């Protein structure tokens, strides 16, 4: 397993140096290291401007929640972080979007490598029509040079990390589509982390799940922040307050306010933020 961990660690350390982690979230708030830097960012779909001159720093190894009413630009921004909007013909952007020293928007950026470094978990679980094992092994087979034994170890490690190993260990070669919704979503998280990403993007990861599965995913998100930088879009105010370290509130394509989650929810600086978190609109 040492060789396997070294292989994954080497990939995760590309373009940045290892940084000691704080012992507690409170310490991390003092001088958080920036993982994602967004400056003067604008985005369009055709002639419609979805994001207006947005600037935001996303700290490393924390959970940052994007909140705001539908159409406010939060999912658009999330999808630009790993260039998912490249597949939208009318999508265009301008500004600065950096992950460490990587210029995400540069035409020379290797998008395949970018999406390995920046994993994505979608609103609806989307396992491949393959076995549970093959879902997790798919990415590593493309990006890593592993023996079968190392691949087996990585699949187990990823499923354990995603808190689903005990539920699937005796049926790894069964169809992934036979899992429950909550299990499928945790499988998708395992699939995302199997290639050693630095960042995990989550777009409404619990909206299609029952309360018990939602709680399991929320607990998992909070644990994963120790190793990954997580950016989560959610319409669920309680969820944002429970499992994020920082919150950014968007309205009509603009960033209204961002800061420690407790501050945004209990002592917001902007009236629109206060109205939104209190449920006066949305």
UniProtKB/Swiss-Prot annotation:
Residues 1-25 have a biased composition (Polar residues). Residues 1-26 are annotated as: Disordered. Its main location: membrane. It is a peripheral membrane protein. It holds the Pfam family ABC_tran. GO terms for cellular component: plasma membrane. Residues 36-277 form the ABC transporter domain. Its EC number is 7.3.2.1. ATP binds at residues 68-75. One of its GO terms (biological process) is phosphate ion transmembrane transport. Coiled coil: none annotated. GO terms for molecular function: ATP binding; ATP hydrolysis activity; ATPase-coupled phosphate ion transmembrane transporter activity. InterPro entries: AAA+_ATPase, ABC_transporter-like_ATP-bd, ABC_transporter-like_CS, P-loop_NTPase, PstB-like. It comes from the Bacteria. It catalyses: phosphate(out) + ATP + H2O = ADP + 2 phosphate(in) + H(+). CDD domains: ABC_PstB_phosphate_transporter. It is an enzyme of class 7 (translocase). It is found in: Cell inner membrane. Keywords: ATP-binding, Cell inner membrane, Cell membrane, Membrane, Nucleotide-binding, Phosphate transport, Translocase, Transport. Belongs to the ABC transporter superfamily. Phosphate importer (TC 3.A.1.7) family. Part of the ABC transporter complex PstSACB involved in phosphate import. Responsible for energy coupling to the transport system. The complex is composed of two ATP-binding proteins (PstB), two transmembrane proteins (PstC and PstA) and a solute-binding protein (PstS). This is Phosphate import ATP-binding protein PstB. It comes from Rhodopirellula baltica (strain DSM 10527 / NCIMB 13988 / SH1). The lineage of its organism: Bacteria, Pseudomonadati, Planctomycetota, Planctomycetia, Pirellulales.
């Amino acid at each position: 397993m040492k060789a396997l961990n070294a292989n994954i660690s080497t990939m995760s350390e590309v373009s940045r140096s290892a940084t000691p982690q704080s012992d507690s979230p409170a310490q991390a708030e003092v001088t958080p290291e920036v993982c994602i830097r967004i400056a003067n960012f604008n985005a369009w779909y055709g002639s419609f401007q979805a994001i207006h001159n947005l600037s935001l720093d996303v700290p490393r190894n924390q959970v940052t929640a994007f909140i705001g009413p539908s159409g406010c630009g939060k999912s658009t921004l999330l999808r630009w972080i790993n260039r998912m909007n490249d597949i939208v013909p009318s999508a265009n952007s301008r500004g600065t979007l950096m992950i460490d020293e990587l210029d995400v928007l540069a035409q020379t950026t290797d998008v395949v490598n970018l999406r390995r470094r920046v994993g994505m978990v979608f609103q609806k679980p989307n396992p491949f029509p393959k076995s549970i094992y093959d879902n997790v092994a798919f990415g590593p087979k493309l990006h890593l040079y592993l023996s079968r034994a190392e691949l087996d170890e990585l699949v187990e490690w990823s499923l354990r990390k995603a808190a689903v190993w005990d539920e699937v260990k005796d049926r790894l070669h069964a169809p992934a589509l036979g899992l429950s919704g909550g299990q499928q979503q945790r499988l998708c998280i395992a699939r995302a982390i199997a290639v050693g990403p630095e960042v995990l993007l989550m777009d409404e990861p619990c909206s299609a799940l029952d309360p018990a599965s939602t709680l399991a995913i929320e607990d998992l998100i909070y644990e994963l922040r120790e190793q990954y930088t997580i950016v989560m879009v959610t319409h669920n105010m309680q969820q944002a307050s429970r499992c994020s370290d920082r919150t950014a509130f968007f309205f009509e394509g603009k960033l209204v306010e961002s800061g420690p989650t407790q501050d945004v929810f209990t002592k917001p600086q902007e009236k629109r933020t206060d109205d939104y978190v209190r449920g006066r609109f949305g």
